[in-house]
């Protein structure tokens, strides 16, 4: 990875740890250029992209597709439900096939944490891998769009007070964000059920009661309760969770005037956040979705720069 002439160049994007601070800032600023119509971009040849999603997705899948088409790439359709995966084909062999067919970029979401390691270590696979989410591992493109949204609002990360609230243990979004936000100088708090928190996160921030910090926050980053990963847990009722840990209208009223609310979506309304607040003045949930297209354009451009 490198930056030349102000442009980020990547072979793969699988975790946030592989990016320098300069590369992170370069890509979120480039996302801003695409958003504001300032980006000068032209393909030097025909490129192919395939989006291989083995877990459900709306925003990540479709925003990558929009980003790819905006940049002029040819997008190869892939449906896991009708692919040879159902005949027992492994993920490795599926990506090996895409590489052999000449696909330049594969965006992959898979339930296996670190699925990408064998792909990027392969001497045969030549396609670039973009991690669209690996189980409860990481989600780098979501992290970058979150960073872009925060940067648009505050112009910096240093000394911002950011609370990541909710199902932290199972959240790839939380794991990507906590690492890079800490490195960029933000002060991180965690809130939510202690059952969904691990002491391994203490190196990044402090677990607190949301009501103890809400008045001081710059950013409240809410996380979806991942019901599909809690099948064997006693859990909470929707009403209990919302009352104890969610953003109620009463908590919203305590936020500072310049504070913003974020959520990676899909939103469980009246669980993580009151239904009435999803599009409230402080909410940036729609902005996050919009920024997702532009920061993913920046990611794809960086991958293509690495192929130049």
Curated annotation (Swiss-Prot):
SUPFAM superfamilies: Aspartate/ornithine carbamoyltransferase. Coiled coil: none annotated. InterPro entries: Asp/Orn_carbamoyltranf_P-bd, Asp/Orn_carbamoylTrfase, Asp/Orn_carbamoylTrfase_sf, Asp_carbamoyltransf, Asp_carbamoyltransf_Asp/Orn-bd. Pathway: Pyrimidine metabolism; UMP biosynthesis via de novo pathway; (S)-dihydroorotate from bicarbonate: step 2/3. Carbamoyl phosphate binds at residues 59-60, 109, 139, 142, 265-266. Keywords: Pyrimidine biosynthesis, Transferase. Pfam families: OTCace, OTCace_N. GO terms for molecular function: amino acid binding; aspartate carbamoyltransferase activity. L-aspartate binds at residues 87, 172, 224. It comes from the Bacteria. It catalyses: carbamoyl phosphate + L-aspartate = N-carbamoyl-L-aspartate + phosphate + H(+). Transmembrane segments: none annotated. GO terms for biological process: 'de novo' pyrimidine nucleobase biosynthetic process; 'de novo' UMP biosynthetic process; amino acid metabolic process. Belongs to the aspartate/ornithine carbamoyltransferase superfamily. ATCase family. Heterododecamer (2C3:3R2) of six catalytic PyrB chains organized as two trimers (C3), and six regulatory PyrI chains organized as three dimers (R2). This is Aspartate carbamoyltransferase catalytic subunit. It comes from Streptococcus thermophilus (strain ATCC BAA-250 / LMG 18311).
